[in-house]
Amino acid sequence: MCASVFFIIIYMFYIHYSHKSVLLNEAIQSLNIKATGMYIDGTFGSGGHSKLILSQLNKRGRLLAIDKDLLAVKIGKHIAEQDDRFTIIHSSFSKMINHVKNIGLIGSVDGILLDLGISTFQINDCSRGFSFMQDGLLDMRMDISSGISAAEWLSKASQENITWVLKNFGEERFAKNIAKILVSKRRYTPIIRSIVLSKLICDAIPHRNMNKHPATKSFLAIRMFINNELEEIMQVLKDALIILSPRGRLVVISFNSLEDRLVKYFIREHSCALSIPPKLPLTNNQIFSKYKNKCQLKNIGKLTPSKQEIKRNIRARSAILRCAEKLAI
């Protein structure tokens, strides 16, 4: 057995027992899966959602998975070798529409799933720099084959730019204090390790929330900025309206307020709920003819984890699942 295959098998064993997909069953139920359907898992990760989707498809069903993380793609390719219903692509979900066009399935996809959270194996891999609790190189890129690392950005960004990122992406009230300390520190020593960044942030915050690590918001902000996460989410949401078939489902799991706000307002903007009072004596066709620019989605609703799931997996506490269905008009 070659070393790479052995590594993947060991790693799959590790993630099977360490990574818990949040709202796993709820997400798959929300997709309302048809056995012969075509589905897209836009964030393959450790493959938990993809495996459950595949278990509900028959021989004619298909699943396309996408991930920016090269290790996730390696794991996915191992599954693809054993199941010809499954394909995985190394890409960002913001480019999903290009891949769907390439296979001629625009307007024919029955469901899109996006799990916007960072995976356990990414957090636990010290070399990635995502964790403020472990020491490692400060990278933070989802795709290590492109873009600049967090360390590179911190070495060049102005104090004003760092402040803006921490405030707007992390909603960090002490953004100015943190930016000032980071710029002062880098004059003498490059900030290239996650534990160093974490300590500097802690030193900059005068009042601490005992229930949350002081570096939580700043690490989130830098990660989201480095990976262009909000713009990519906005792009895939817009494209989903074109990709989905009539009655196709869009299911998104968010883990912070900025992501959830984007998803919530997108669904509201493209559904009829904002502009049409309930119980009007009108058919769907009549409503659509009057409000066709807005009425493209039906808001199915939102779900949050149970107390039992949060107890089993603390990562679940901030998760919100939102689901919408493309109108069949």
UniProtKB/Swiss-Prot annotation:
Keywords: Cytoplasm, Methyltransferase, rRNA processing, S-adenosyl-L-methionine, Transferase. InterPro entries: RsmH (IPR002903), SAM-dep_MeTrfase_MraW_recog (IPR023397), SAM-dependent_MTases_sf (IPR029063). Its main location: cytoplasm. Pfam families: Methyltransf_5. It comes from the Bacteria. One of its GO terms (cellular component) is cytoplasm. One of its GO terms (molecular function) is rRNA (cytosine-N4-)-methyltransferase activity. One of its GO terms (biological process) is rRNA base methylation. The keyword Cytoplasm applies. This is Ribosomal RNA small subunit methyltransferase H. SUPFAM superfamilies: Putative methyltransferase TM0872, insert domain, S-adenosyl-L-methionine-dependent methyltransferases. Specifically methylates the N4 position of cytidine in position 1402 (C1402) of 16S rRNA. It is an enzyme of class 2 (transferase). It comes from Blochmanniella pennsylvanica (strain BPEN). S-adenosyl-L-methionine binds at G47, G48, H49, D67, F93, D115, Q122. The gene is rsmH. Coiled coil: none annotated.
